[in-house]
Swiss-Prot record:
Coiled coil: 264-309, 651-803
Gene, per the UniProt record: ATG11
Species per Swiss-Prot/TrEMBL record: Candida glabrata (strain ATCC 2001 / BCRC 20586 / JCM 3761 / NBRC 0622 / NRRL Y-65 / CBS 138)
Keywords: Autophagy, Coiled coil, Membrane, Protein transport, Transport, Vacuole, Virulence
Keyword hit for Lipid biosynthesis: no
Membrane protein topology class: Peripheral membrane protein
Pfam families found in the cross-reference section: ATG11, ATG17_like
InterPro entries per UniProt: ATG11, Atg11_C, ATG17-like_dom
GO cellular component: Atg1/ULK1 kinase complex; phagophore assembly site membrane; vacuolar membrane
Keyword Mitochondrion belongs to the record: no
UniProt protein name: Autophagy-related protein 11
GO molecular function, one term: SNARE binding
Family the UniProt entry places it in: Belongs to the ATG11 family.
Length: 1110
């Protein structure tokens, strides 16, 4: 059965099968890998608030609702007390709103932190607002060209594709967002039910205490013990007097008073607990109402039907626009004449333009709706964190109440019960005393019976000893003469005396030593007998004789004083078949010994060669004499063989043999059964080992499968996120390409117009240049003719008189100079460039200079590579020589030629400065191409944009660091300890002064020296001595010292503490928060001068709240 796991942080859901997880630990590990929540921070709840534990993990299939709610325990860290209606009346609305806003802000920060740690994408950041189509700004009614129409329609189709992707994305995440919101609402409701179950347990514990107290009240005997004491115990006599002597009346009266006070104490505690439980119940009810209100809030302003209608309308209009655009673009270019464009294309494009505006309006409405939905989800998440914090706060309070009930109330109720039991025992004293007398009588009876049994045992021992003595005498009488060669006097009975002494001895050591000696002798004799029988076998004596000795030795070995005990066993106590077989074997041996004893009870029936020698007479006939028979019987009785007396008939013998046969068959059957069961047990054990091996292999395979499933799940999620990122990147690139395409189209149109204007201007300039060249050729030809004429005149004049030569030469040179100057001025004024071109050239150089100046002001330098290409590089320290006042928008930029460091700029400026003195057009084209290089491939724009992005990133980082440092500064500011110029809410160190209030002389000077102008850098040894002295003085009895705030840095003002609540008692120092400061002036020494300060002294009376003490 699959279960839906709901994430309480994001609302995501996944389907899992709990059967693939071995335990709860593996399930939590899977959720941790899936959602990035630490395993230790995961809390799992079933429906109705049931907590998922190891004990109920395997019983999840019993639940009706297959859902598991996953909580991050860090969501409960923002504990805050919920506000009820009573709180709203008690506190001001402004304070409540401020607290709520503060908590919501902290919840938003916690949500961002958790989502960032889990790397959960923020959909608000992924939304891109739809941008207008380039077709909207086109003035179609004024007329358009075929090229413009095709370009705009193609661009509009790209815009329409991007817009459809955005709208489909809005629709997809809209449904998911609604599902997530519903999942979050169910998670919040389940957590509230969990709190209800927890509170129900505490209420049940409280009710059990109340019921127990009521039972104690109903069965209370504290009011009847006096009557019982006076009317019964004082009149009922026992062995040693009246029973009232066993009851201390004074102590019972004391306990009665204690019980009454304890009853009131327990009642007051339970009432207080009831009051707090009701308060928490009201807060829970308030949380329930708020949760219901949150669930009832609609996700969007418009209904789903309206959204679907908008989606359908958008799709319909988009299909119409695409079809109309394709109809135009698919037609042959030859059809696009001016008339066709005017009659056919323009109306269609106007209609497309209107529908494009409608599409933009619909898409923006969907965007706004999606943005509102995501904002609502985020606000809902914040509210969930706030409510979870309130639930955690109530649970903490309920937990404290539970501990209080379990510890304090239970202790009081236990004491209450013990006191009631003591009062109840007073009424039970007559019965208990009667039982005591009966028990004492029973012990007397037992003692009497025990004495009788001990006397009987003593008599039994004497009888057994006498019987043993008789047996020995009879044996000696029959065999004593034959045993004389063994050199042992068998007529002595020292061993019986030793046993008697041992019984009368109190030494445990002697008893143990006696028994150990007997065991040693027994082992020694046993070894001798075994060796003796072995030697008889080796010597080849009669087998019958050896068998008699072996059987006799076996009987003697098995004989003991307790052989009369019945050998039947209680089979109900036998737990092992081997023990049962062993007991049957023992019984068989016992029966065999009885048969053997019966067969050899008569000496005459012994085999030949046993005590039958030729040199000795036979003392007994075939039938044993009565004395010998009695001797055998006594011997058998002493050795514990009394059961043989019952086997006197052949019938009994037959029964015993039959029983031995049956028991042998049972033993054989049991041995076979035992062997069969042993084989079955071995087979079962081997199967169990195989099962364990298979189980281990299955567990290992399942672990590998779980790891592989987790890895595949993570990979799937990564691929999904990567696909989303690629889709968003594609949309952004499409948008940027659309914008760039539009800009390029606009630039192309502008350049086309400029090119046409330049072509016209160029043709005009070429015609003027041709005219100027013709005029220049004419002037050169005229000048050459004039020079030839002048030369001829000069040669003619040279022949004149010598006295007129110098004057004629001067006049001629003057004429030549004038003609030459006229020619040069004509050439200069005939420059090939018009004033408009010169003006454009100047403006172009100014724009270029300003751009280079802007680059260097933002730390970028224009350089040239070895290949002749321009580069813009980031150079540190470049702005040190530039103006630092450019942040002022009203400031004017100073001349920039002297502050630009770029070598490229200086080369281009040199080219520009040579243009007025050079009429070559190639130099002008070289200047224009050099300037154009900086704007090729968006070099200038890319450098500026990237630089501003770096500046923006740096600004964000610095803003974040500034915010954190501001928080630290505020924290340190709040914890700062003031030492001068005190104000309200400052923290100050308060110390006692050196003098008491009762001493008036030199008090002010000592106070001033104690707290003014303190050098904080001095060593602390002297301060320690002063503190020690002040401690000694503070410990003096009946001395009241005034307290003052510690001051430093030449602070001459005196700040005395207003100690109304005696907070300084038994303290050496404390840190307090100043709550009030009152300025005082000593106007009269005798009045209003509690500290005996000089006249006109300004001092301050401080009220402070204690923050920290020693």
């Amino acid at each position: 059965m699959e279960y839906r796991c709901l994430d309480c942080t994001t609302g995501d859901t996944i389907a899992v099968d709990l059967k693939v997880f071995l335990d709860l630990k593996e399930f939590k590990s899977y959720l941790s890998n899936k959602w990035g929540v630490p395993r230790a921070q995961i809390l799992l709840l079933y429906p109705f608030g049931i907590k998922l534990k190891d004990s109920n993990f395997r019983h999840a299939s019993d639940l009706e609702s297959p859902e598991i709610y996953v909580y991050d325990r860090r969501l409960f860290s923002l504990t805050n007390e919920p506000h009820t209606g009573a709180d709203a009346h008690a506190d001001s609305d402004a304070d409540a709103d401020a607290d709520t806003a503060d908590v919501e802000q902290q919840a938003a920060q916690l949500l961002d932190s958790l989502l960032e740690q889990r790397r959960h994408p923020q959909l608000q950041d992924d939304l891109i607002r739809p941008i207008p189509s380039p077709l909207e700004d086109l003035k179609i009614a004024d007329g358009i060209s075929h090229r413009t129409a095709v370009s705009m329609l193609t661009t509009n189709l790209g815009w329409l594709s991007a817009l459809e992707i955005d709208v489909n994305y809005y629709s997809s995440i809209s449904d998911k967002c609604k599902e997530d919101t519903q999942s979050l609402a169910r998670c919040l409701g389940t957590c509230e039910q969990y709190l209800g179950l927890y509170c129900y347990d505490v209420e049940r514990l409280y009710n059990s205490n109340v019921v127990f107290l009521d039972q104690l009240h109903e069965n209370s005997l504290q009011s009847r013990w006096k009557e019982c004491y006076k009317n019964t115990l004082t009149k009922l006599a026992g062995l040693n007097g009246y029973l009232s002597q066993y009851v201390d009346e004074a102590k019972q009266i004391e306990k009665e008073v204690t019980l009454k006070s304890l009853d009131g104490k327990v009642n007051s505690k339970l009432k207080q607990i009831k009051k707090e439980l009701d308060s928490y119940a009201d807060q829970r009810k308030s949380i329930q109402n708020e949760i219901e209100n949150l669930k009832n809030i609609k996700d969007m302003k418009n209904d789903d039907n309206e959204l679907h209608e908008m989606q359908k309308s958008f799709d319909s209009i988009a299909d119409t626009v695409r079809k109309a655009s394709r109809d135009i673009l698919d037609k042959d270019d030859a059809l696009f004449t001016d008339e066709y464009i005017t009659q056919e294309v323009v109306p269609v494009m106007i209609d497309i333009q209107k529908k494009v505006k409608t599409l933009l309006t619909v898409s923006q409405a969907l965007y706004e709706n999606m943005h509102e939905l995501l904002t609502h989800k985020r606000n809902f998440q914040i509210q969930i964190i706030v409510k979870l914090g309130q639930i955690a706060w109530i649970q903490l309070q309920i937990s404290e109440l539970k501990q209080y009930l379990l510890n304090d109330c239970n202790a009081d109720l236990t004491l209450y019960k013990d006191l009631e039991v003591e009062f109840a025992q007073i009424e039970d004293y007559p019965l208990i005393y009667g039982l005591y007398l009966v028990e004492k009588y029973r012990r007397q009876v037992w003692k009497c019976g025990m004495a009788k049994n001990m006397i009987s045992i003593s008599n039994d021992i004497k009888e057994r000893s006498a019987a043993e003595l008789t047996t020995r005498k009879n044996w000696y009488k029959n065999f004593g003469e034959l045993s004389k060669p063994f050199n042992e006097d068998l007529t002595k009975y020292n061993d019986l005396d030793e046993i008697s002494k041992l019984m009368n001895s109190d030494s445990q050591f002697l008893k143990e030593k006696f028994i150990q000696d007997l065991r040693n002798e027994q082992r020694k004799l046993e070894d001798v007998i075994k060796s003796f029988i072995k030697n008889m076998h080796d010597l080849g004596l009669s087998k019958e004789t050896t068998q008699v000795l072996e059987q006799s030795f076996k009987e003697a070995s098995n004989s003991n004083i307790c052989s009369q005990i019945d050998v039947t066993y209680d089979h109900r106590r036998i737990n092992n078949e081997n023990d049962l077989i062993k007991r049957y074997k023992i019984r068989i041996r016992k029966l065999e010994s009885l048969l053997h004893e019966q067969g050899y009870s008569s000496i005459s029936k012994w085999p030949s060669g046993v005590l039958n020698h030729t040199d000795r007479p036979n003392y007994f006939a075939d039938n044993v004499s009565p004395a010998g028979r009695s001797l055998l019987v006594s011997s058998s009785a002493l050795l514990g063989l009394e059961p043989s007396a019952s086997l006197k008939t052949d019938a009994e013998m037959f029964d015993l043999k039959k029983e031995i046969g049956d028991l042998s068959e049972k033993v054989t059957a049991l041995e076979k059964d035992n062997k069969l069961k042993t084989d079955q047990l071995k087979i079962t054990h081997s199967k169990l080992i195989d099962i364990e091996v298979e189980k281990a292999a299955f567990r290992e395979t399942l672990n590998h499968l779980n790891k592989e499933l987790a890895r595949l799940t993570v990979n799937e999620e990564d691929q999904t996120n990567l696909l989303k990122e690629e889709r968003l990147r594609f949309k952004k690139e499409m948008t940027s390409v659309t914008v760039v395409n539009q800009n390029l189209m606009n630039n192309l149109d502008a350049l086309q117009k400029t090119f046409e204007d330049v072509e016209l201007e160029n043709a005009h300039l070429k015609s003027k240049l041709k005219e100027l060249q013709q005029r220049q050729d004419q002037l050169i030809e005229d000048s050459a003719n004039e020079k030839l004429e002048i030369k001829s005149k000069y040669e003619k004049l040279i022949k004149e008189k010598d006295e007129n030569m110098g004057q004629a030469f001067a006049v001629t040179n003057k004429a030549i100079s004038g003609e030459q100057n006229k020619t040069e001025s004509d050439i200069i004024h005939s420059s090939p460039y018009p004033e408009a071109i010169l003006h454009l050239r100047t403006e172009l150089f100014d724009i270029f200079s300003t751009n280079i100046y802007i680059l260097e002001n933002i730390g970028l330098l224009l350089t040239e590579t070895s290949a002749g290409k321009f580069e813009i590089k980031r150079v540190k320290g470049l702005k040190k020589g530039l103006s630092q006042s450019l942040l002022d928008e009203s400031a004017q930029i100073s001349p920039i030629d002297g502050v630009i460091n770029s070598v490229v700029y200086k080369n281009i400026r040199a080219q520009y400065e040579q243009l007025p003195n050079d009429n070559n057009i190639s130099n002008c084209e070289l200047f224009i191409s050099s300037v154009k290089k900086i704007y090729e491939n968006k070099l200038f724009e890319s450098a500026v944009i990237n630089r501003f992005k770096d500046i923006e990133t740096l600004a964000k980082r610095l803003t974040k660091e500034n915010k954190s440092k501001r928080i630290l500064i505020d924290l340190y500011q709040n914890e700062r300890l003031a030492v001068k110029d005190f104000r309200v809410n400052d923290l100050a160190l308060f110390l006692p002064t050196k003098e008491a209030l009762s001493e008036t002389k030199s008090l002010s000077s000592s106070m001033a020296s104690s707290f003014s102008s303190v050098d904080l850098s001095t060593p602390i040894s002297g301060a320690n001595n002063n503190i020690t002295a002040s401690r000694k003085s503070l410990h003096k009895p009946n001395v009241k010292h005034p307290w003052a705030a510690f001051t430093a840095f030449n602070e001459s003002s005196r700040y005395f503490l207003k100690d109304e609540n005696m907070v300084t008692d038994n303290k050496e120092w404390f840190i307090g928060k100043i709550t009030d400061i009152q300025r005082q002036v000593v106007e009269n020494i005798s009045t209003n001068n509690p500290f005996k300060l000089p006249k006109d002294t300004v001092w301050y009376l401080i009220s402070a709240e204690m923050i920290s003490i020693d």
